[in-house]
Curated annotation (Swiss-Prot):
The type I restriction/modification system is composed of three polypeptides R, M and S; the restriction enzyme has stoichiometry R(2)M(2)S(1) while the methyltransferase is M(2)S(1). This is Type I restriction enzyme HindI endonuclease subunit. It is an enzyme of class 3 (hydrolase). GO terms for molecular function: ATP binding; DNA binding; type I site-specific deoxyribonuclease activity. NCBIfam families: hsdR. The lineage of its organism: Bacteria, Pseudomonadati, Pseudomonadota, Gammaproteobacteria, Pasteurellales. It comes from Haemophilus influenzae (strain ATCC 51907 / DSM 11121 / KW20 / Rd). Keywords: ATP-binding, DNA-binding, Endonuclease, Hydrolase, Nuclease, Nucleotide-binding, Restriction system.
Amino acid sequence: MLNENDIEQLTLQRLQSLGWEYRYGKDLPVHEGKFARGDLSGVVFVEQLREAVRKLNPQLPESAVDSVVKSATKSDIGDLVVRNQTFYKLLRDGVRVEYTQNGEQKIEMVRLVDFEHWGNNRFVAVNQLEIRSRKGGKRIPDIIGFVNGLPLVVFELKNPLRESADLLQAFNQFETYKDEIAELFVYNQALIISDGIVARLGSLSADFQRFTPWKVVDEKNKSARLYFDDELQSLLNGLMQPEDLLDYIRYFVLFERDSVGKTIKKIAAYHQYYGVNEAVDSTIWATSEKGDRRIGVMWHTQGSGKSISMLFYAGKLLAQPELKNPTIVVVTDRNDLDGQLFQTFSSGKDLIKQTPQQVEDRDQLRQLLAQNEVGGVFFTTIQKFALNEEESRFPILNERNNIIVISDEAHRSQYGFTQKLHNGKFQTGYARHLRDALPNASFIGFTGTPISLEDKDTQDVFGRYVSIYDLQDAVEDGATVPIVYDDARQIRLNKKDHDALFAEIDALLEEEPSTSLRLREKLLGSQERLIELAADFVQHFAKRNEVVDSKAMMVVSSRQICVDLYNQIIALHPEWHSDNINEGAIKIVMTGSASDTPEMQKHIYSKQEKQTLERRFKDPNDPLKVVIVRDMWLTGFDAPCCNTMYLDKPMKGHNLMQAIARVNRVFANKSRENGGLIVDYVGLAKELRAATQQYTNSTGKGQLAEDVQSVFFKMKEQLEFIRTLFATPIEGKTFDVQAALEKDNPNDLLMAIRFAANHILSLDQLSFDGKAHEQHWFNKKETEPRKKAFLKTAGLVKKGYMLCGTLAEVEPYNQEIAFYDAVRAILTKREQKGTGTNERQILLKKLVNQTVYSEGVIDLFDLLEKPQPQISLLSEEFLQTVKNSPTKNLWVSAMERYLASEIKVKSGTNLTLQKDFERRLKEALNQYHNHNLTVVEILDELFKMSQDFQERLALGKKLGLTKEELAFYEALSQNQSAKDLMGDEVLSKLAKEITETLRKSVTIDWQYKEAVRARIRLLVRRALQKYKYPPDKQEEAVTYVIKQAEEIAEDLTGL
């Protein structure tokens, strides 16, 4: 069957087929030759780098080459991502060097790689390269991709057939490597984790949720999109082609500061890479003599990184020689969007290699565009293209043909060309003015939502879709999370309220310019309704936070309602209020004017204060949990930790789609199964259906939001399946869940949870007849282990509960769900080796009931009501206690986990001891799972194994051997005939002599020098002959001894 090495070899073969050289890391000498890296802690093939610098910069004297290599490989301290950013600038832009040649002082930027001609570089894939850890010992990444001797890509691979060897484990290994061999990651540009089928790509600073797949190799060929085929093959073909990798590194890497000022690294997802490259190609054509100035439309769904895609596009565009240093004008239709995009580009100014400029007013716009002759990135709202009072047509500002206009959210305001009569004059839309001002400019539209059906002329204005990445693609890839919709909480008015309000209609008709709008505001903003709304919101949000840490946006119809609702909420929770901008759990974010009332003025903030609120709301640890808005923050605003939106404002179409996308960002409190939640107070189901229809008619795939009721129904089906498992008899007895739930004594409840877990384990010991799976709701094969089916279904129930747990209909199930989760905790404990993901820690913080608690995992030793240190796992008393336990199956799992951990930890560097007991454990468990051993027999075997292991550990003391001597004694004792012939005393003397001989003979990194290894083999062979080790087994013994010596190399050299 497949193992991890098979996946490694397959990956290396594929890399070679793409043009990479291959070298086996353990064959590469550390100190000499083309693959020398200084010492065992080195990570750069210095001579390869030196050779590349000479080749790519032939004009340099040798002293300058040395200086460049030294600058590129200089060790430093400090934040790893900051160090990585420093190196990235050297890699992309070159190393600045000063030197004297023929008496002339010269300054040059020296290339480390040739981005233009990939064939001038050397691409080498190296596996099993040993790197010294800062904690001692060594770390061995599976595969490292070197370009000109620089380690730019690292792979960590796992076995697809081992359930415990998952991508999370690979990610956690990277986290360990970053700590112990940090120098390797100073140069890194891509991290890849895979089990040979599933594959994910991430940046140096990405958390696990941000590692994403690479689903297509050709964006133009949509049929090439993969679902559950070979993601690793797709990633290798899409990213690791040498030419593509250099293009990716050069144009699709971005460094930013997060909300708390920490440097983070972002790299493009595949849809950004292909979409931007297609857009750049289309731009070059559109601006050519044959082009029509229509670049196209990029539709990348909200939350999938559209703003960063625009930045990547601008960065690559500015570097294209065909465009002769173009000017980029970014146009939005709202000030807040303009500011948000400007901030994104300002943070990424290293990528565009210039400082963007935000246009302040109409006069500055005209001046900048008219005077600009080359380059520049300008941000403006389209309203600044308005006519002056005396103008009938907008004047031409610049006739250059290398001006690119990026239109964010390409909808009607961006291409309003028709005239309308206003105050006796014909007026044209702003888009007409924009094109009059820049008659030879080319246009591209970026949108996160599809263009509405009524806007038939979109492609006539911007051109075809150059890239589509719709909602279904984004959710499947993990770029966004799904949205769940709850419309069961509408707050309606009673008849008395209606009568009183409609009595005011006559007055409104005389006083208000927009009667329907003002009437709607009065209806939604009536005091009695807001009192009810505030009460419901507070109750719902509190319940939501009991399930998962949450932040929320409340969207209302007017600024006055913002203030009135705020007052109602703080009347219920006065501790949420604070006048200090840096304190308080709830704030209002809205525009203001000088004529606002004093009550409203308290909630009007300066630009700097709004930035403070943005930072606070984006910080998951900040106490600001709720913001109330009317229009602000509903488009372009990105706060990934916001997972709930309350809608109390009638919306439709484009605006509705933009708003609800605020909760679809990837974050630890959301997942593919547990997405963002939309709570509807005004009845927008019809509008949501219409928006979905608009979405799918625009060739997009995916559902905008799933009904929370459908989640509830799915959860009930899942609960029913779990009940069938407990209703399946074991030795004639079923498990009575209802009786367990009625227990109010904690000890009794704990006992019931233990019995339930034992019942699930026992199901897999039955001879299978299929009956237990007749109601298996997710239609897996009937031979699927019942424990696995329970764990999966209980996990889905938990995630479903997070979304629909606030429904009144769910309350009767609260205790039952908590009970199943407690059972799940016991069963999964042995599989949680080390730290789990954040998702595991937060998915179910506290269920809404007072009887069953599911915080943490239950320790089996606690079930014996004894402190763990007082229990001897080797005592007969303990063995009998377990044998008499009604949960023997549970103890098998506990003992398996205990022994596996003991063997791994206490064997240390003793290879023979570790392999012997790992083999025994595996064989025993196979016997048990194949029903060749009963539960009592396997317990006997595991306890006997534990005793034998302790005796082997104590053997060194008995024989008077050190740790290293014992390791060699074990290696020599693998030959039973030698042990029988020579006896313990002679073998012990031989082990001591070999240890002493090696101590005197080995040097640092001896295992990498073939001449030294040959001499060591000779010395070992002489010692074996001296003590008359059986001749027919000597070569085998030499091999064992050398392997053991390599394992304890640093102990032998005294490092």
